[in-house]
């Protein structure tokens, strides 16, 4: 890493960017090239640095169920980012957008159709209602085994934001309104996944991400006491008990500052206080 040029080091931070790509190009969503349907991957053009493949999915890995290969790479059959049953209900413009993100889904004649069937584990809220960390760790073990099988390095989960309001559209992904339950469940899931060599979790969304509407621009105004007693506590538990391989900051601003740009949040609390490595 020390031998990298500044240009190569920068490439490692922006996904598998192709400067020659024409038209619609996404760095995240279903942008994986080596594993079809994976959310994204790091740049594979930097010599000596292998790519890092990331897969989304709150209830297990979300990959393209079927795909084919040709001289240009791997391509999903159907839409890699949206099930056909949901695509049928979308408007014409939305179908166009989703097809651009997920591919046209039509296999070429003569190409072999390959499969990537992943296990659907219970969603976060259901897992938390079990209060059974051993079971949650077993679910993580299932995900970790499939990560090894399909060649995925980072799972972009678990999400442990607090159930602050019933109106949040992603509450089902999150564990609980209780930060203790949230932290314990995320730690158990992480231990299960990371028992597999080369596999890691990405706990998210750090922090105070409790609404989906306008999530890239909304500003969470939270007191220090509320942050420490509610919104940060689960992350601290998870980091101390399982040391996840990655932490994803949230899109929202926190008290006027983007979370990824907050030294207090990322360095002082996450690293120095929680001990994240």
Where are these regions (language model features)?
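Glycoside hydrolase catalytic-domain context in secreted enzymes
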Residues: 1-277
């Amino acid at each position: 890493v020390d031998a990298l040029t500044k240009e190569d080091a920068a490439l490692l931070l922006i996904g598998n960017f192709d400067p020659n790509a024409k038209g619609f190009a996404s760095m995240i969503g279903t942008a994986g090239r080596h594993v079809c349907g994976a959310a994204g991957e790091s740049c594979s053009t930097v010599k000596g640095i292998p790519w890092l493949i990331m897969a989304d999915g709150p209830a297990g890995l979300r990959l393209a169920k079927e795909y084919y290969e040709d001289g240009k790479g791997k391509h999903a059959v159907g839409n890699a980012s949206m099930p056909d049953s949901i695509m049928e209900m979308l408007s014409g413009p939305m179908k166009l957008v989703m097809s651009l993100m997920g591919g046209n889904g039509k296999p070429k004649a003569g190409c072999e159709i390959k499969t990537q069937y992943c296990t659907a584990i219970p969603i976060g809220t259901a897992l938390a209602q079990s209060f059974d960390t051993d079971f949650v760790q077993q679910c993580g073990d299932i995900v970790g085994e499939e990560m090894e099988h399909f060649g995925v390095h980072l799972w972009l989960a678990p999400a442990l934001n607090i159930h602050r309001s019933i109106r949040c559209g992603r509450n089902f992904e999150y564990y609980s309104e209780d930060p203790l339950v949230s932290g314990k469940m995320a730690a158990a899931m992480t231990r299960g996944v990371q028992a597999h060599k080369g596999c890691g979790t990405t706990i998210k969304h750090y922090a105070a991400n409790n609404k989906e509407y306008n999530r890239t621009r909304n500003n969470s105004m939270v007191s220090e006491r509320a942050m420490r007693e509610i919104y940060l506590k689960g992350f601290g538990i998870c980091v101390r008990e399982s040391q996840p391989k990655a932490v994803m900051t949230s899109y929202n601003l926190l008290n006027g500052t983007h979370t990824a740009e907050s030294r207090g949040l990322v360095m002082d609390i996450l690293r120095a206080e929680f001990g994240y490595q």
